[in-house]
Design a protein with these regions (language model features):
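N-terminal extension/subdomain marker
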Residues: 23-28
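Exposed, low-structure sequence patches enriched in small/polar residues
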Residues: 1-16, 31-249
């Protein structure tokens, strides 16, 4: 059983309103000099584990767990009354189940596979499966080692990509899709020669990022003299592929 509590606070202070008007595109809180945001997360996990080798039939260790997470985000908000500020609380919860299968003993083969699925709450449908392993073979008096690691993850964009309220940046993105990431990487090692060959590929679908949305400031002749700062969340609905390869001798 584990209990994890995270408390995070951010306070933004800016007294130079003239500079804010010049530098930022938006000043949602008017001349207010301070805006705050708070994040609280409480995660409770209960699990049961069967250790590798606890009897002659147990060739691998097995763990199963159940997790519940409560999250609260407090953001400064405005009202219909000019100058009035309130704290808007966004409450989220997520219930997930998971398991782990691992083999650490012996010399030939080792592996670890960890999976988790959100079955209810804000993150329902989110899942991740991660695995890594190594195979060790004797060949011509040398040890040849093959390492493999891979994962597939389908994850909800983080809260602050979905909702954010502050003095200069403000958005509500209720239509963001889950981010799908898959990766496969392998490494071949020859101990005697000190040779390593590594290759990997990763695919990202619905890549979500913070984009520069600044606008140009022009003089009376149309020349760009500067920019007013702004940012926005963007999501690329296509696929992004990353390939890597390395030979080390």
């Amino acid at each position: 059983h584990t209990l994890q509590v995270d408390l995070n606070n951010r306070k933004y202070i800016s007294y130079d309103d003239a500079q804010n008007q010049k530098y930022f595109e938006h000043n949602y809180l008017g001349t207010d000099s301070i805006d705050k945001t708070k994040r609280t997360s409480i995660k409770n996990t209960i699990g049961i584990a069967l250790q590798e080798g606890f009897n002659k039939w147990a060739k691998a260790g097995l763990t199963a767990f159940l997790s519940y997470e409560y999250r609260n985000f407090a953001l400064t908000d405005t009202t219909n009354i000019p100058g009035q500020r309130i704290i808007n609380n966004y409450k989220e919860s997520s219930l997930s189940i998971g398991g782990e299968l691992s083999k650490k003993q012996g010399k030939l083969l080792h592996y670890n596979i960890l999976g988790e699925l959100a079955i209810a709450g804000e993150d329902a449908g989110q899942f991740s499966v991660e695995g890594r392993g190594d195979l060790n073979l004797r060949l011509f008096g040398d040890t040849v080692r093959l390492d493999v690691n891979a994962f597939i993850k389908n994850q909800n964009p983080v809260f602050y990509f979905r909702h954010f309220q502050s003095k200069h940046y403000w958005w509500d993105n209720n239509d963001l899709s889950k981010i799908m990431r898959t990766r496969l990487e392998g490494k071949l090692s020859l101990n005697r020669w000190g040779t390593q060959l590594r290759a990997g590929v990763e695919n990202i679908k619905n890549y979500t990022y913070l984009a520069n949305a600044s606008i140009p400031v022009k003089d009376s002749e149309g020349n760009v003299t500067g920019f007013k700062n702004n940012a926005a969340v963007r999501q690329h609905s296509g696929n992004i592929q990353i390939f890597t390869a390395m030979l080390q001798q």
